[in-house]
Amino acid sequence: MKIKHFLPLLLLLGSNEMLTAQEIALTPQPAHLTVKDGRFEFGNQLKAKVTPYQGDSIRMVFESFKKELQEATGIKVSSTQKEAKARIILDLNPQLPAEAYKLNVSKKQVRIEASRPAGFYYALQTLKQLMPRNVMAGVATSDHSQWSLPSVEIEDAPRFEWRGFMLDEGRHFFGKDEIKRVIDMMAIYKMNRFHWHLTEDQGWRIEIKKYPKLTETGAWRNSKVLAYGDVKPDGERYGGFYTQKDIKEIVAYAKKKFIEIIPEIDIPGHSQAAVAAYPEFLACDPRDKHEVWLQQGISTDVINVANPKAMQFAKEVIDELT
């Protein structure tokens, strides 16, 4: 009888150990992850040592993490130059690739190694994922019993240099706050290229000062719903656009999260919104009626590439963007 009960007990213990490893849910999955015994307990306050770096950029990365941590948990992190007193250590390791990092969480301390600010930033995103979900969500809670981390050793580096996400705002306008939220989510998942689709047949979303009608006319259409099949235009005035000030603000916001913004401008096709704004030199037939498109799909009302003025328009739009 004892033997019969002993074998299931061994299997149960083994399954619990496997489950512990499975519970370390990180996205993207690190290249190497080892789970150890014990947990790192935060307490109400702790000290951190941050390696010096040009422009103090590593410290700025950590200050952003500190702010998020305190807002969600109330835990205060102060600085120290003495490693023996530090419970969080950010240490330079020149041997690591630019976006790579090592993260070692033990019962006594959290140690992060990287060679560039981006590596430290990605390590801190992983650290947030190891914490309770409300930290990722930025939602405050007073239950300090939750504030601990599993003991782990992680070595990680991206498989791909270009890790992109595309958002189509030509067809539907989302606005500045939503774009920042998208950038926040990209940063959590260590994506680094935001493909921002800003023009389409159905709308032009970026201010071009040399061609103001692109947003005065091209940013607006007479239906929120795009017609398709049995779905008809609803007649609602709909649209929006970003000023150049908005664009600069969003670019700066993304840069702090190591995300490069790639603006997408469709020329000569997918351009009916632009044609509607300047039919006199963009349209293949200026005598036709041209309006911002109300349909799903792709319009055949394209920019006339045989017109030198249209080619000059394309050049000047790109020049103003850059």
Regions found by a protein language model. Give the residues of each.
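Bacterial Sec-dependent N-terminal signal peptides
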Residues: 1-25
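Contiguous, structured surface segment used for ligand recognition
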Residues: 22-160
